[in-house]
UniProtKB/Swiss-Prot annotation:
The gene is atpD. Keywords: ATP synthesis, ATP-binding, Cell inner membrane, Cell membrane, CF(1), Hydrogen ion transport, Ion transport, Membrane, Nucleotide-binding, Translocase, Transport. F-type ATPases have 2 components, CF(1) - the catalytic core - and CF(0) - the membrane proton channel. CF(1) has five subunits: alpha(3), beta(3), gamma(1), delta(1), epsilon(1). CF(0) has three main subunits: a(1), b(2) and c(9-12). The alpha and beta chains form an alternating ring which encloses part of the gamma chain. CF(1) is attached to CF(0) by a central stalk formed by the gamma and epsilon chains, while a peripheral stalk is formed by the delta and b chains. It is a peripheral membrane protein. It catalyses: ATP + H2O + 4 H(+)(in) = ADP + phosphate + 5 H(+)(out). This is ATP synthase subunit beta. Its main location: membrane. Gene3D superfamilies: 2.40.10.170, Bovine Mitochondrial F1-atpase, Atp Synthase Beta Chain, Chain D, domain 3, P-loop containing nucleotide triphosphate hydrolases. It is found in: Cell inner membrane. It comes from Haemophilus influenzae (strain PittGG). The lineage of its organism: Bacteria, Pseudomonadati, Pseudomonadota, Gammaproteobacteria, Pasteurellales.
Amino acid sequence: MSAGKIVQIIGAVIDVEFPQDAVPKVYDALKVESGLTLEVQQQLGGGVVRCIALGTSDGLKRGLKVENTNNPIQVPVGTKTLGRIVNVLGEPIDEQGAIGEEERWAIHRSAPSYEEQSNSTELLETGIKVIDLICPFAKGGKVGLFGGAGVGKTVNMMELIRNIAIEHSGYSVFAGVGERTREGNDFYHEMKDSNVLDKVSLVYGQMNEPPGNRLRVALTGLTMAEKFRDEGRDVLFFVDNIYRYTLAGTEVSALLGRMPSAVGYQPTLAEEMGVLQERITSTKTGSITSVQAVYVPADDLTDPSPATTFAHLDSTVVLSRQIASLGIYPAVDPLDSTSRQLDPLVVGQEHYDVARGVQGILQRYKELKDIIAILGMDELSEEDKLVVARARKIERFLSQPFFVAEVFTGSPGKYVTLKDTIRGFKGILEGEYDHIPEQAFYMVGSIDEVLEKAKNM
């Protein structure tokens, strides 16, 4: 190990001087004698390297001795990490003792080559009606949950983990990137109560941590997921929240003195996003299905951060504040959400026709809303009145009680199979349920529950 000393400290950015013949490589991990880990970001010349601190730089002083580990950050991987909470360096933070891993992997790795990659068109059923119908997920695909503050990204993600972990019984890795510590705590207890904790590895780098931790914690989680994939498993990789990953990159970029680009983001935004997203892929050995929550600043989907993320995804689930304000949860916008899987060759003709029919009716209702607002319902033709009635039923039928929200809604969660979902919406489109009041469609599971509820109204 070669040793150097700290020559400058500016917040999370630390300059370390090494002998000219032993300058560390970019991304090497350095250990300060106080126990803090640094990651090399730039070589400034003259034996000086500029590093980002992966932890608080409080109490550091110039002249402290720094050792070069000659490797990037190495984190524990494998089944020993299941049921445990670790930080960006792979150190356990759940007070359950050492992990006792057999193997450690570097967090900086190259993406699988073209020959190794595979694409599948197998669908992954989530049990959430609106998602399975409008924006179905592919096994080994990438899904983005887009939404502003407080429209339900984390709750949707927790429901997906619960449903898929229980129904699909595979391993999951959850990376909490720059989110609230309270959510991390809720999440841990939710997994524990659902008895799926022994199938989930949790990696947390929360809001209160320095930007270096928040920037690298996604890579730590991804490295653990890659290990499971390379063992031939189908893994689920959840990231909450990709926007905070971008934001940490912006902070690090500014600290390193790079010129900002559009809206103050780092000039390397697209490249940083690409490096992460290209590694989240399925190979011929195993698959990684990823679900990523993406915060949309000021509800503006054209902001560079969400816009850069869009390009990498197979399915986009857009959560809308307008739908949430109607009390319809999950607040998924059926007209804005898309999926590459919604193709008759993949999902079958019936599913495709029903999904497009639902979108068609909702689009027509959206156009009629202006007329209704000015002239009232009575001025509509009989045909349009029918469209409005069916659209309102569809809107309500797209809502669903969640297992993870039982505490708030007071009604038990529902898992709806794809077959039941298609049957229900097909019936509404064909007018089989025109005689049933629209209130019966609100917050239920399958169409059979609607009929049951209507009897008691």
